[in-house]
Regions:
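Periplasmic c-type cytochrome electron-transfer domains
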Residues: 1-148
């Protein structure tokens, strides 16, 4: 049987099983247009800025002096952070979004892990891990994303 071209984009191989449309019943990411104005990021709002999204989550064994996604930040501000590209996430009295509870245990549904392609943590579908972006490359990428 000839496999017709798929309308799904990205890393996708057409499904030839009994239920060929099951693989496209999935989350569809939004366009990057206006991404600078849609903080906080990830499905649960656990990353306050695009700059933080380009960083990895701190894991056990990671060096203390590295740059990581914040484990907590203030929410409720409408003040734009033009450097990190998101909403101001500190320096005012707001609600504190926490990844972990007082015991240091991760709060279910509040994880800020995943989608760490630019930090050299998440592998591509072929298993290849891309090299991490340095700070200058992250800032250059943010400048581009501001134009969308």
């Amino acid at each position: 049987n000839k496999i017709n071209p798929s309308i799904k984009h990205g890393n996708y191989d057409p499904d030839t099983t009994v239920d060929p449309f099951a693989s496209i019943n999935a989350y569809k990411a939004r366009s990057l247009n206006g991404i600078w104005a849609t903080a906080p990021y990830l499905h649960n709002g656990s990353v306050p800025t695009l700059y933080d999204l380009l960083l990895p989550k701190k894991r056990e064994g990671d060096p203390e002096d590295g740059e990581y996604r914040p484990d907590q930040f203030e929410v409720g501000s409408r003040e734009f952070d033009p450097v990190k590209v998101g909403l101001k996430s500190g320096g005012y009295k707001g609600f504190t979004f926490r990844i972990t509870n007082a015991k240091g245990e991760e709060i279910k549904g509040n994880s800020n892990a995943g989608h760490e392609y630019t930090s050299g943590k998440t592998a591509q579908p072929n298993g290849k891990i891309l090299p991490p972006l340095n700070k200058e490359e992250r800032l250059d990428l943010l400048e581009y994303l501001k134009t969308l």
